[in-house]
Amino acid sequence: SLNIIKMANVSISIAVLSTGNELKEPWQKASNEEIYNCNSFAIIAQLNEKGFNATYCGVIPDNLEKSIDFINSLKKYDVIITSGGISMGDADFMAEAFLKNGLEVAFHGVNVKPGRPIMMGKMDSSLVICLPGNPLTAMVNINLFVIPMLKKLQGENAFYHGYIKAINQSSFKTINGRVNIVLGRVQNGNFYVTDENKYGAGMITALYKSNSILVTNASTSNIESTQEVKILDLNVIYF
């Protein structure tokens, strides 16, 4: 009756940044004590692949006052995505800096391994998403939490993860009491766990070897060979 045929999707503006004095840009030279800022560019690549408009806004140093000022300059964006600075380290100022800018925290931390340090909330009209600093956990959280949320925020109808069923090909252990995120490859209906589920939170090679994620229940302590499992295909269409 309103003569509306189709709702238009809304293009949202997204700011992406990292934090840490130890970070160097890919075009800069890093010492043995420094690391390259791969998170921001990996996050932007993931978002661009999914059709989002993301802008790189730089690196915030580990300084509270500078963090507060930097964050205040980002309030023009619909979404602000950061990586690093939200753990319990002495130099992790991001949470406090956002709070000083009026952030209303929805949650801080999830019972997930890897990927526990994550914070989301609302700051004025901006949605704030703070991801872990470790590359593997940041990219896992982008796929699990962020992309579906952004799809919904942008007005898309399909934003739920699409799961497939596969047969696990080798047994491996998981941590009881936590929801475990297990990387692997799905091929011809079979799931092959990556590196026996033994890799660190900063090992981006595990991501390169994987095309899917197995999400366990918190009560699970091991996955048996030939067990049927539900898999999140990283290339699957959203529903």
Q: Which residue ranges define each predicted feature?
A:
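Short amphipathic alpha-helical segments
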Residues: 28-30, 92-96, 142-144
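N-terminal small/polar loop signature for handling phosphorylated ligands or for N-terminal nucleophile
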Residues: 44-100
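Residue-level signal for inorganic ion chemistry
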Residues: 16, 47, 81, 184, ...
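Short, glycine/charged-enriched hinge/interface segments at domain edges or termini
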Residues: 1-56, 213, 233-237
